[in-house]
Regions:
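Flexible "arm" and connector segments at domain edges
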Residues: 1-59, 63-105
């Protein structure tokens, strides 16, 4: 029914779009963001003693809410994540270069 060979981000976007097209998923942008915020609160309130399985489940829910908000807003979540990763890499490489210069002094 749903391709499992796709990367998780792309797969979740396609599943959410299909659910929306079938009128199964009725959430709007604000609801998706509220779902994400609620999930963050659950993760935060669970504390450090929460099990890995429960934490993994909640983070998965968070990611799905974010992908849904992106889809509703017409933003390609794959491209957004790639761009954010590229920005992080640029900052990280700059920090490495600055540390290298400082070590050389």
């Amino acid at each position: 029914m749903f391709q499992k060979a796709l990367p998780a981000l792309l797969r979740s976007d396609k599943v959410l779009k299909r659910a929306a097209d079938a009128n199964v998923e009725q959430s709007d942008f604000d609801t998706s963001l509220k779902d994400a915020a609620d999930t963050i609160d659950k993760i935060r309130n669970a504390g450090p003693g929460v099990g890995q399985s429960e934490l993994s489940d909640r983070i998965g829910d968070l990611l799905l809410s974010i992908v849904n908000a992106s889809r509703i807003a017409g933003v390609n979540s794959e491209e957004s994540l790639n761009y954010a990763t590229k920005k992080f890499i640029n900052r990280f490489e700059l920090q490495e270069q600055m540390a290298s210069v400082k070590d050389a002094e």
